[in-house]
């Protein structure tokens, strides 16, 4: 009997493994092809005094979304240029009013900035709602169902607590931000679920601090010992090098953690970025951008996108086609425009 139960359990596990399909993300863009889009966007934006920037944004997004594939199907970017242009016009007007009032009437300006601070969570929510509902995969749109109170917490309260705790609560603040964004996002009618634990965030921050201190000490010893730089110059260079490595480590570690900790119903994700692989791509990009006086920038964006997508997988258990597209949410036009203009992207 025990043997029979063991065999049945083994068969069930085998069936479960066989029913899972690992789908790799793939970016099929080309650096030379994107360069043509990039250079035309810059030229037209300049000669139209910035008006074409809305069309440039749409062209860029449609290129990158349309060249990102999963299971043979690409993503789609649905936003229209005029939606973005209206938002940017409103943003310029609001910004000009703020600057003008702050200069002429400092007290009134301070009050308006305070109002903007309280409006930021609303703008953030509307911005993400706009971006998500203008992103689709297999003709099913994404959604973002934001809550003002939660947004205020992750944008204002938790960062403030991180500040007054001298950074000790920053890992928890970042966890709250990731939880809010992922748990409020849906594909069709199905919500994403984010299950990362706070200890993972503290572990990453701890390693990051260790890398920072280690590089600072090593760089200072090498630079001071060589006699090529003054102590102040050595400190500045060491700080710059340490900053680059720590930011790179955080990018790799948190990208992996967010994907691994995110699920969509029974479907899961995996990310396997490595510090070595990412640093290699970043250093090559920086070198070629400097050598080409910035002309390699479009190809650099394509190169980093290719690397990141090549390290991301969707573990499909069942069929994604079973998801039902949610009805389009009626997002306030003013909220969309302000959010798009102020570009509250994470």
Predicted regions and their residues:
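Membrane-helix interface segments in multi-pass membrane proteins
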Residues: 3, 7, 95-116, 213-247, ...
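Membrane-interface extramembranous regions at the lipid-water interface
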Residues: 3-40, 55-90, 125-155, 173-208, ...
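Active-site-proximal cofactor/substrate-binding loop regions of enzyme domains
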Residues: 33, 45, 52, 74, ...
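Pore-lining and gate-forming transmembrane alpha-helices of multi-pass membrane transport proteins
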Residues: 37, 113, 204-208, 232-244, ...
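Hydrophobic alpha-helical transmembrane segments of multi-pass integral membrane proteins
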Residues: 44, 85-99, 116-123, 157-162, ...
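Selective recognition of hydrophobic, aromatic-rich stretches within alpha-helical transmembrane segments
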Residues: 46-60, 105-134, 163-184, 229-258, ...
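Hydrophobic alpha-helical segments of membrane proteins
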Residues: 205-221, 249-257, 283, 290-291, ...
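Long, low-complexity, intrinsically disordered cytosolic termini of multi-pass membrane proteins
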Residues: 292, 330-346
